[in-house]
């Protein structure tokens, strides 16, 4: 009997440590330390993404982050969308970034060039990047009462339209797990449907 109780206590302790290790409250997610927006600027290609609720870019997504003369960060993105379940087209999105106390945590005000496309003000957190190969971003649109995210989206970006090297993929997978989004991403194809230049 004592062995069973001891085994149960060990199992409960292990379970508790696993749950504590995977804390999915948004405020506990780590972002890029010492983020440098000048190094981050330029063209990034989405190679994977976790979708939010609502109409969103599907594939062939390229984003261009720019530092304006006044120091503000802006972005344009282009990608394929499907409207009314039938019509497919390449859509342009425009974003303006509002800086916060943490350089890697922006608020992004965005809108589509077409009125039917999404518009809003979302978090835009740079979770990790090496500036030359990969970047992973995260946004939580709505939170649950317990602080976890109810509606989020995330992009894995590459400087190379053909994807990420295996070493970068391993880093990105670890970060996806830390965001509690492991196995929630889908591959973003680049088949020439939209111009990326």
From Swiss-Prot:
One of its GO terms (cellular component) is extracellular space. Keywords: Disulfide bond, Retinol-binding, Secreted, Signal, Transport, Vitamin A. Residues 1-20 form the signal peptide. Its main location: secreted. Substrate binds at residue 118. It is found in: Secreted. InterPro entries: Calycin (IPR012674), Lipocalin_ApoD (IPR022271), Lipocalin_CS (IPR022272), Lipocln_cytosolic_FA-bd_dom (IPR000566), Retinol-bd/Purpurin (IPR002449). Disulfide bonds join 24-180, 90-194, 140-149. One of its GO terms (biological process) is retinol transport. GO terms for molecular function: retinal binding; retinol binding; retinol transmembrane transporter activity. Retinol-binding protein that mediates retinol transport in blood plasma. Delivers retinol from the liver stores to the peripheral tissues. Transfers the bound all-trans retinol to STRA6, that then facilitates retinol transport across the cell membrane. Belongs to the calycin superfamily. Lipocalin family. This is Retinol-binding protein 4. It comes from Xenopus laevis.
